[in-house]
From Swiss-Prot:
GO biological process: chromatin remodeling; DNA damage response; mitotic G1 DNA damage checkpoint signaling; positive regulation of DNA-templated transcription; positive regulation of TORC1 signaling; regulation of autophagy
Described function: Acts as a linker between gene transcription and histone H2B monoubiquitination at 'Lys-120' (H2BK120ub1). Positive regulator of amino acid starvation-induced autophagy. Positively regulates MTOR activity. May negatively regulate the ubiquitin proteasome pathway.
GO cellular component labels: nucleus
Compositional bias annotation for Gly residues: 432-443
Boundaries of every WW domain copy: 120-153
Protein name per UniProt: WW domain-containing adapter protein with coiled-coil
Primary location class: nucleus
SUPFAM superfamilies reported for this sequence: WW domain (SSF51045)
Residue ranges with Basic residues bias: 72-82
Lineage: Eukaryota, Metazoa, Chordata, Craniata, Vertebrata
Coiled-coil positions: 529-555
Provenance organism: Danio rerio
Bias kind Polar residues: ranges: 22-32, 188-200, 223-234, 321-378
InterPro entries (alphabetical): WAC, WW_dom, WW_dom_sf
Amino acid sequence: MVMYARKQPRLGDGCTDRRDSQPYQTLKYSSKSHPDHRHEKMRDSNDATPPCKMLRRSDSPDNKHMDNTGHGRAKAIHPHRGREREGGTSISPQENSHNHSSLHSSNSHSNPNKSSDTPFEPADDWSEHISSSGKKYYYNCRTEVSQWEKPKEWLEREQRQKEATKTAAVVNSFPKDRDYRREAMQATPASYSSTKSSIATEKPSSLTPSSSSAAVSGLDVPNSASSASGSTVPVSPVMQSPAPPTLLQDPSLLRQLLLALQTALQLNNASVDMAKINEVLTAAVTQASLQSILHKILTAGPSAFNITTLLSQATQLSNQVAQQSSQSPMSLTSDASSPRSYVSPRISTPQTNTASLKPPLSTTPVSSQTKINAMTVKSSSLPPPSSQQPLSTEKHHDNGNSPRTLQRQSSQRSPSPGPNHMGSNSSSSSNNGGGGGGQGPGVVSGAMPPGSVPPGTAPGRATCSFTPTLAAHFNENLIKHVQGWPAEHVEKQASRLREEAHTMGSIYMSENCTELKNLRSLVRVCEIQATLREQRILFLRQQIKELEKLKNQNSFMV
């Protein structure tokens, strides 16, 4: 259906328009403007309606952007559109937006809301209008065709814009008006320089090739030489300085760091009151409080704990876990799609699932073996690794402040966090194993080749974490009989039975439906037959009356 736009009459300026048959107001074709329109533009600039939705000529984007040399600019835009038409589809939307901005950059009356209010591009001929009945319609200025539906080109352009804004929002995850690096460096006291080595152990010293998606996944990695703007910073393969601010913006990373620091402090024994740290951790809900707590812990100085001893202890503990678990031939691995864990005999270095999820609330020194058993061993859901890295290469890589020790610390010996953050440690171990397909939003990846995981972190599904009150009443021995293969078997049986019941029920229902339809049709047939009989009876009665009349007439005549 072709519908031409009707021109609404302008109010009281007495100027008639020569192009009444083409009333579209778009950015494409400039119309000659009356000088009074500049004053109307000043009055209408307070109107919150976007200019593309209005049908008054004084509100059209052309007149909003028309200066004294309006005719010259109209002439400049026409050959520009002609060039674009000759170019055809070879002009990319980026080039179009660049040309459009370069055409309008010299304008002194530019509207700041124009880029967000007017979704036009110079390459598109469709424009949006409101008809007299109030419905939106779309008008093509080249073919002079109007239609109600959105045209294909319009939908494609909207899709492109959505994708562009989505990628821009993900890459530029921090607001541009704040400089987090400068704020964090101002908020950090002078004693922070003494603990720079401790932070360096918790920051990745090198990034794997697959970690270039870290900037896309919300973790901007700033160079030390980058300017203090919020724009995206290219990810360098090796970081030149330990930069804490980006680390302090990610809530999941903050929680993992806090848990790692907590277990580190507990391993180093009784220099800090662990009950207070636990209280603070459960109370720290917001990201700002987490940042302040982490600043306090980090700037407490190396007197509170010694990072090098922690690294050696972490390596020894992972070695112990690997040796202890290699005695049993099975391991707990997990299906990436299901939340349950099952026993798999495929992997030689198993994962020990432990008995208690209660967070440590005491500072009494316990042996490292019982500490391993007292906390949950958590790791992200990874496919079975193609090659396990031996411990000697692990130690060789660890002397460069590699973050895998931090990952092992936070994944092996971390107590369960508070109720507001369920299973955050599942994202702490690095996610670049085969088939991983990029990284999660809080993943610090170490210098590991893809497909290999550190020893001691065999892929096991992260169990859901409990609040301390729930963890006190949790006993894993009571659910062991439905864990692993039995649970898998029972779930498969249950799903099969559910599907069978569903199909049988649907079959029965369809049979009943067809039977009911058949009976209903029979009832309808009976009704039709009854009406036919009634019609026959009425017809016969009428004939009987006529015959009686004829009989009476005959008797009179005789």
